Design a protein with these regions (language model features):
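Active-site recognition of the HExxH zinc-binding catalytic motif
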Residues: 103-117
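Short pre-active-site segment immediately N-terminal to the catalytic Zn-binding motif
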Residues: 89-106
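Generic "edge-of-domain/loop-turn" microfeature
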Residues: 43, 95-97, 113
């Protein structure tokens, strides 16, 4: 018998809250100002994206940036009465078809992009290739131990049942699958 409903983004938000609470590296993250969303992609294509962080501010938390003589701003986004600093998109079904540990690696990867100042900007890793600082593999090594420690913890919680479910298992287990969906915001000309 199917359960009535699951909100995928709410469950992932709760997992992120656990990460921020249990990991010193992510303690600066205010989960109430990070909106988790679903995006769609084709399940049968190889490679591709599992998750994406969208910062809602520019370098050093600036609200505007001048580019080619024009002034740009990101749209302001309020959720739950709070202005959001970041959006994190997880791609359905691709992300959900990963094994549990790989899902957590994607979540940690996207969270690590959040600036330590939590100012709406990304963590800058260098002058060139600022997002990953060169090789992505090295980027993922920066939080690899924390992923393993968190996985050891989460395996003892009810969240592991969710992490073990792929897209088919979710569809088979719930009458309704929901989550926040929104078009990815882009900078707009303000002057």
């Amino acid at each position: 018998m199917k359960l009535p409903e699951i909100n995928l983004t709410d469950v992932i938000t709760l997992i992120i809250q656990e990460i921020a609470h249990r990991s010193e590296t992510f303690a600066h993250i205010d989960v109430h100002r990070v909106l988790v969303c679903l995006a769609s992609n084709r399940s049968n294509s190889r490679g591709g994206t599992f998750g994406k962080l969208v910062p809602l501010r520019f370098k050093d938390g600036a609200e505007t940036v001048r580019y080619r003589g024009r002034l740009y701003a990101m749209p302001r986004l309020n959720h739950g009465g709070l202005e959001q600093r970041y959006l994190i998109y997880f791609y359905h079904p691709r992300f959900f078809n990963l094994p549990p540990l790989e899902k957590l690696k994607v979540v940690f990867h996207e969270l690590y992009h959040i600036s330590p100042d939590f100012n709406g900007d990304v963590r800058r890793m260098g002058k060139r290739k600022a997002l990953h600082g060169g090789l992505r593999e090295r980027f993922d090594e920066l939080f690899e131990e924390e992923v393993r420690e968190f996985y050891a913890y989460i395996k003892k919680t009810p969240y592991i049942k969710f992490l073990n479910m792929n897209a088919h298992a979710l569809k088979s287990s719930f009458k309704k699958i929901s989550g926040h969906r929104m078009k990815m915001p882009k900078p707009v000309v303000v002057g």
